[in-house]
Amino acid sequence: MKKIILLFLTIYTFSFSIRDFNGINWGDSKENLSILFSNLKKEPSINENVNIFSVKNPKENIKKYEFYLQNNALNKIRVVFDKESIGKRELQQIYNQLTTTIGVPVLKLPIYKKIDNLTLKGNTLKFVPDTQTLIYFTGIDTINELGKMTDSNLYLDYIPSQNEYIF
């Protein structure tokens, strides 16, 4: 009987897991994430209803994973790439891997946001890997009031397919 229950849990976990994050499901709590990532660290959040937990340096070229929990339920995963090690060649490799494993993006959206004297400019590509998850591949530059780029970042955002994407 224990084997049947264990088999069911294993099949459930891997059948409904978030793409690229085996064992993690939408709606998981911090406690569930802690089982897979024992070194979760709380990050500051501008939204009091959202807690952000991160894992530093989980893989090569990745600075950290960020897990966004609203009401203690996972509703977004952000992969923050290490901008010191990502160049044009690595960017192309990431894009090629996405298009090879998922397919071509279904949408390209420009990003243009003014925040005080800074401007965020970039693009995001929307991928649909399955019926439960959407993936957004986003490159964003921060431009100061003098028109100079002060920062540049690259993200992969995973969200449940029923959620609206807000950068």
Cite the ranges covered by each PLM segment.
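Short hydrophobic/aromatic-rich motifs at helix boundaries and adjacent loops
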Residues: 1-5, 66-68
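Sec-dependent N-terminal signal peptides
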Residues: 3-13
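Generic detector of isolated residues embedded in canonical secondary-structure elements
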Residues: 14, 32, 57-61, 71, ...
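N-terminal, post-signal-peptide region of Sec/Tat-exported proteins
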Residues: 40-80
